[in-house]
Every structure is written in structure tokens, then in C-alpha cells.
């Protein structure tokens, strides 16, 4: 079983800012969310815990790892959020009003050909490579980012999340049966 988790809340999440690959820390709320998630996950055995190397995901994974004897968190750059260059740090309101290409990127990133440091197809390739390397006989927690998780589910595994993935939400993925379960911890 693979458990896919979005990092806890950051100050930029609260301000409605695009983070991308900016290394933004968790807020107090995000730390508390991670602690609450750790308690909800404490009875699930994880053989391994992987995380994006960005601090907001890594700190979330570290908090979870305190309840699990896995030997620590394994950072993997392939789990990073998409790099969006000059859009990073700007509010979503600003982007919608002042960056006409942002709407195309947001709604159809696979069609966007603009100037960003990382193309959508490259994100999918690195995610696909990561998941193909996992030992699918193990129970694994993966902590990553909203855009990455959404498109991992949608475009690699053909599962369309109906609503955005919340901070510290965990999605359970049964690799053998290719099924997903949201809100299984609530």
C-alpha cells in the first residue's frame, strides 16, 4: 500500500501564494496538522517514508516518522513541487489578473508552452520514474506537494480528484488493484 500525503500548511498557503520550489517552512498550523496526522497514522506500519527535499514536506514527514521505526525519512528531489520561476511567491489573485498564461497553465498544464523552469511533461516523467522504482510489496508513505500529487493521480494513475488535496490529507493507493481512497483517516 502506498500512502500519499500533502505537506502541512505554510504561511504562503494562508496568504494564497504560489510556492513552487521555494523552500517555505511550515507554519505553526502546519506543524500541528502534521502532529495530528501522525497520531491518526500511528497504527499504520510504514516500511519506508519518502519526502520531497523541500522543507515543508520534509518537516511534515519527519513529524510522521517519529511514530514509525523506519530509519528516518528518505528525501527524493523527484517529489518536489513543479518549478514555476517568476510566478513563485506571487499571489494567485495577482497571477489570475496579471499573467494571462497562468489560466492556461492552471487549467491545462500539458498544453502550456510558456517560459517556466520545468515543463509539465518533465514533472510527470520524474514522478513516474520515482513510483516505478518503489517496492510495491512494502507499505510506504510519500509526502509531497499539491500540484505534484494531483497530477500524479490524474495523469499517471487515471484518478481524477474531485477537489483539491488538503494540507496533510492522506490518500491511500492500493497499487495491486489500482484503487484510491480519500478521507480514510477521518
Feature names for model-found ranges:
Residues 2, 136-148:
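Generic beta-sheet signal
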Residues 11, 56-58, 81-82, 148-150:
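Short, active-site-adjacent cap segments at secondary-structure transitions
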Residues 9-68:
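Active-site-proximal alpha-helix that buttresses catalytic centers in soluble enzyme cores
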Residues 159-181:
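Domain-level recognition of soluble alpha/beta enzyme cores
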Residues 1-3, 48:
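Extreme N-terminal starter segment of soluble prokaryotic enzymes
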Residues 25, 67-126:
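Phosphate-handling substructures
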Residues 63, 151, 155:
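Active-site signature of alpha/beta-hydrolase-fold catalytic machinery across serine-
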Residues 46-53, 74, 139-143:
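Short glycine-rich phosphate-binding loop at a beta-alpha junction
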Amino acid at each position: 500500500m502506498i500512502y500519499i500525503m500533502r505537506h502541512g500548511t505554510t504561511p504562503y498557503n494562508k496568504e494564497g501564494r504560489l510556492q513552487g520550489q521555494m523552500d517555505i517552512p511550515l507554519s505553526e498550523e502546519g506543524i500541528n496538522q502534521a502532529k495530528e496526522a501522525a497520531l491518526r497514522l500511528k497504527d499504520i506500519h510504514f516500511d519506508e517514508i519518502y519526502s520531497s527535499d523541500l522543507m515543508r514536506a520534509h518537516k511534515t514527514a519527519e513529524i510522521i516518522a517519529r511514530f514509525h521505526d523506519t530509519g528516518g525519512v528518505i528525501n527524493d528531489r523527484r517529489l518536489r513541487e513543479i518549478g514555476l520561476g517568476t510566478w513563485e511567491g506571487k499571489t494567485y489573485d495577482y497571477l489570475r489578473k496579471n499573467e494571462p498564461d497562468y489560466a492556461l497553465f492552471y487549467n491545462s498544464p500539458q498544453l502550456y508552452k510558456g517560459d517556466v523552469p520545468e515543463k509539465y511533461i518533465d514533472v510527470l516523467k520524474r514522478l513516474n520514474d520515482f513510483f516505478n522504482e518503489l517496492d510495491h510489496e512494502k507499505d510506504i508513505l510519500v509526502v509531497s506537494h499539491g500540484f505534484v500529487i494531483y497530477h500524479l493521480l490524474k495523469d499517471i494513475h487515471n484518478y481524477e480528484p474531485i477537489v483539491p488535496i488538503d494540507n496533510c490529507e492522506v490518500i491511500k493507493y492500493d497499487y495491486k488493484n489500482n484503487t484510491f481512497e480519500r478521507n480514510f483517516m477521518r
